């Protein structure tokens, strides 16, 4: 079908203007592992987030990465593994639409994307390849069992859209031009998966496609200023496996929903009640 997006038209098999693309029927997620991609200095928030997941999924394993932050090895047990790695987030904060093509920023972006792939592989191995995985951060609160729409392989709320600005749209045309060179992929025009809750084997398929076609996909960093943030990079990996992000009405965000405390959403993002002023990335 031909879709009009402002001053642009695209041809695709689905309407990206539709945010809610899910089926009504849901099934519970029972077998899941948690990968904390980047905990920095958020000690109290990290502990609370982990405690919450244990209350809901006590048998799940958790892989925790501190990228240049505090040492969380004191949390280790048979179901939690800790890894101290380099800070790949602070340098990305300084990248914007004006400077992302600078050679040094290209290196930063590519390094961050490689770290995400590595952490996914390490985390899935430790979690023993559960049916589902959750790549998350300390500002996510899982306060109930999560369900998935039948047929979905990647959950999110699809709040971001490629035609937000002309520069974004141009960037996503570039991203999708790269994807179109690879058989079996689908376009990506909406995303917003924080935390990323996805089907493990589908993700592994996407990673395999990414690595086999790295000569093409290494150019992702040249199309858009933040292709490596994991809320976008993982949906790109799923698009490589032919699967879209599917809208989940079980997600909410504290900054968008003033009633989040009393809502029934099991997945809460932007939960920062346990953050301190020095918990954020940057120069502190």
Question: What residues fall within each predicted segment?
Answer:
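Catalytic core and acceptor-binding pocket of nucleotide-sugar-dependent glycosyltransferases
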Residues: 142, 182-284
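Short beta-strand-to-loop acidic/aromatic patch adjacent to the donor-nucleotide binding site
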Residues: 130-141
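A conserved hydrophobic helix/loop-capping motif in glycosyltransferases and polysaccharide synthases
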Residues: 32-41
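Juxtamembrane luminal stem/stalk of type II transmembrane Golgi/ER carbohydrate-processing enzymes
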Residues: 1-28
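Active-site-proximal specificity loops/subdomain of glycosyltransferases
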Residues: 65-129
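Short, well-formed alpha-helical segments that are part of the catalytic scaffolds
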Residues: 42-56
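Short loop->beta transition adjacent to catalytic acidic/histidine clusters or analogous donor-positioning motifs
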Residues: 32, 56-64
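Conserved donor-nucleotide/metal-binding helix-loop-beta segment in metal-dependent transferases, i.e.
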Residues: 142-172
């Amino acid at each position: 079908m031909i879709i009009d997006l402002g001053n642009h038209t695209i041809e695709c098999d689905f309407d990206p203007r539709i945010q809610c693309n899910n089926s009504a029927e849901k099934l519970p997620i029972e077998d899941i592992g948690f990968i904390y991609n980047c905990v920095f200095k958020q000690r109290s928030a990290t502990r609370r987030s982990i405690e919450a997941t244990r209350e809901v999924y006590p048998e799940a394993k958790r892989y925790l990465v501190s990228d240049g932050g505090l040492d969380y090895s004191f949390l280790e047990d048979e179901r939690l593994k800790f890894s101290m790695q380099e800070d790949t987030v602070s340098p990305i904060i300084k990248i914007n639409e004006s400077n992302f093509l600078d050679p040094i920023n290209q290196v930063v972006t590519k390094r961050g994307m490689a770290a995400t792939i590595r952490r996914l592989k390490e985390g899935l191995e430790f979690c023993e390849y559960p049916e589902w995985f959750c790549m998350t951060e300390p500002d996510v609160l899982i306060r109930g069992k999560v369900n998935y729409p039948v047929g979905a392989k990647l959950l999110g709320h699809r709040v971001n859209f490629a035609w937000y600005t002309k520069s974004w749209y141009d960037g996503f045309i570039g991203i999708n031009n790269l994807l179109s060179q690879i058989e079996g992929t689908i376009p990506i025009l909406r995303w917003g998966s924080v935390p990323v809750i996805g089907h493990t084997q589908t993700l592994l398929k996407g990673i395999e496609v990414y690595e086999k076609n790295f000569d093409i996909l290494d150019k992702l960093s040249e199309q858009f200023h933040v292709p490596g943030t994991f809320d976008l990079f993982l949906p790109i990996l799923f698009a490589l496996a032919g699967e879209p992000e599917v809208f989940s009405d079980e997600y909410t965000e504290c900054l968008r929903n003033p009633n989040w405390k009393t809502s029934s959403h099991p997945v809460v993002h932007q939960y920062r009640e346990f953050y301190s002023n020095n918990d954020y990335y940057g120069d502190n």
